[in-house]
């Protein structure tokens, strides 16, 4: 997928910390992405699902529904958009769950801005090769 095509995609961001959600939106929009934000997994499920060519940026630890539960529900609804997991809780358990959920990109808080864009682009290229 060429850079121009990647930029036309919508990035669905699910994060329950409002300050982080605003920061992620700003960061992605500054890079030219279309962005939709959701404060929880249930909000995303109720308001709109990603389509082909879109990407998800999902927080791992959320109050109502954790990121992995959201990913499982989306996969159950045949949503195949690539996922970039954001977490402040790295470790072997998270890595194992990510791998079993098909998540290949993990971004660590609080260093999101250092690598988020690169991970989003890589996830989308892997999901939609040119």
Language model: regions and residue ranges:
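Active-site T/S-Asp motif of two-component receiver
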Residues: 58-59
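Non-catalytic signal-transmission and effector/linker regions of two-component phosphorelay proteins
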Residues: 1-12, 18-19, 46, 114-130
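Acidic, metal-coordinating helix/loop segments flanking the phosphotransfer/catalytic sites
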Residues: 37-55
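Two-component/phosphorelay signaling modules centered on CheY-like receiver
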Residues: 18-36
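Receiver (REC) domain active-site loop signature in two-component systems and cognate sites
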Residues: 62
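A Lys-centered signature of the CheY-like receiver
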Residues: 109-110
């Amino acid at each position: 997928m060429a850079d121009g095509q990647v930029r036309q995609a919508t990035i669905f961001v699910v994060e329950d910390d409002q300050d982080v959600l605003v920061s992620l939106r700003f960061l992605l929009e500054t890079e030219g992405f279309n962005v939709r934000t959701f404060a929880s997994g249930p909000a995303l499920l109720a308001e709109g699902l990603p389509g082909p060519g879109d990407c998800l940026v999902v927080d791992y630890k959320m109050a109502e529904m954790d990121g992995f539960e959201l990913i499982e529900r989306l996969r159950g609804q045949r949503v195949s958009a690539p996922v970039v997991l954001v977490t402040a809780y790295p470790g072997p358990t998270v890595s194992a769950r990510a791998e079993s959920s098909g998540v290949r990109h993990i971004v660590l808080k609080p260093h999101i801005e250092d690598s988020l864009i690169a991970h989003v682009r890589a996830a989308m290229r892997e999901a939609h090769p040119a």
